[in-house]
Amino acid sequence: MSKSKTIVRTKFVDRACHWTVVICFFLVAVSGISFFFPTLQWLTETFGTPQMGRILHPFFGVLIFVVLMFMFVRFVHHNIPDKQDIPWVKGIVEVLKGNEHKVAKVGKYNAGQKMMFWTIMSMIFVLLVTGVIIWRPYFAHYFPIQVIRYALLIHATSAIILIHAILIHMYMAFWVKGSIKGMIEGKVSRRWAQKHHPRWYRDVERLEAKKESTEGMK
């Protein structure tokens, strides 16, 4: 039985969640930036009007949190740090040259992707908590003004960190050829998998061999 030239990298449900977050994050980030910079008030037109932007901003933020928590449950076991992350970090120069397969036996996600995962998840949690504290007219009146001021500062700082993290994530997705295709179509070439995630590719091969063996016994 000949092997397919491609393998499944990302299931449909995960791709749907990813692109839902992408769209919502764009709307939330754009509207959030406009709140802090009056000269960029026109950015709120993504929601129709400035008033609608202020109303919908937190609701879209909550939607992002819910979807990301669903993704957290699905991906956390792949993002636990392991000993293979150490040589990857130490060999970052070779990694940037495209030779990561020479420095570490990378699983489904490399050390950089794991750091990105935990950064995004931690920042979205902080943004939710601080966002609830400053959310008018529903929750802000339950907190003293000093708490709201600190929450605003932390919320803005976390948002800046998250926006930069997402920009890095986007750059790396374009930089590593084949990555975006995996998130759009859900599949990557065997060569891509073997080069960038050799340990994960071996696991996929083992599962394929086991499946073929089971089917052959029927």
Task: Please report, for each region that a protein language model flagged, where it lies by residue.
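Membrane-embedded alpha-helical bundles that constitute the cytochrome b-like, heme-associated redox core
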Residues: 1-218
